[in-house]
Amino acid sequence: MRKLVLTAALALGLAVPASADLPTGAQAPLFTTQAALAGQEYGFNLRSALAKGPVVLYFYPKAFTKGCTLEANAFAEAMPEFKALGATVVGLSNDDIETLKRFSTEECRDAFAVGVASRRIVETYDVALVRNGQDTGFTSRTSYVIAQSGEIVMVHSDLDYRD
């Protein structure tokens, strides 16, 4: 399951081939965005999060859809493992902050933050969901595991939330 792969990548520092344009070994683009944790809005800053330890950025298409809800539930269940590794997990989508505040409580179970994936973030992380050559306005289901140094150590991109 994907959560075990991500946990292993954090623990072992493994590099895994990526299907996204940001390759393993690249520096993760820094950003700030609106986010929600346990229903409370705050400003997420990747630089600040990395100062505390590794970060798992996971992009998902849309809050409260079947796949995204199940993926959020899986991350929430795996949070003890991520916390044991000192990792921060944050989910990003292009949903508005009010939707994310609800999602952070109802589906993320107050266990991790979710943030607004601005157009700039979507472009710099190369996570626009494109179908038939057209940008859908959603993000792809892509996860980046970022070491505390800012280096991307794993990329996983697959619309099937079960991977």
Report the location of each language-model feature.
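Short, internal strand/loop/helix patches
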Residues: 90, 104-140
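A short beta-strand-turn-helix
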Residues: 32-54
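Structural microenvironment flanking redox-active thiols in thiol-disulfide oxidoreductases
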Residues: 69-110, 121
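Hydrophobic beta-strand anchors of alpha/beta hydrolase catalytic cores
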Residues: 56-57, 89
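Aromatic-flanked redox-active Cys/Sec active sites in thiol-based oxidoreductases
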Residues: 58-64, 94
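N-proximal helix/coil linker or "cap" segments that precede and/or mark the start of modular domains
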Residues: 5, 9-36
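Short loop/turn microsegments at loop-to-beta-strand junctions
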Residues: 29, 54, 140-142
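Thiol-/selenol-based redox modules, centered on thioredoxin-like
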Residues: 137-163
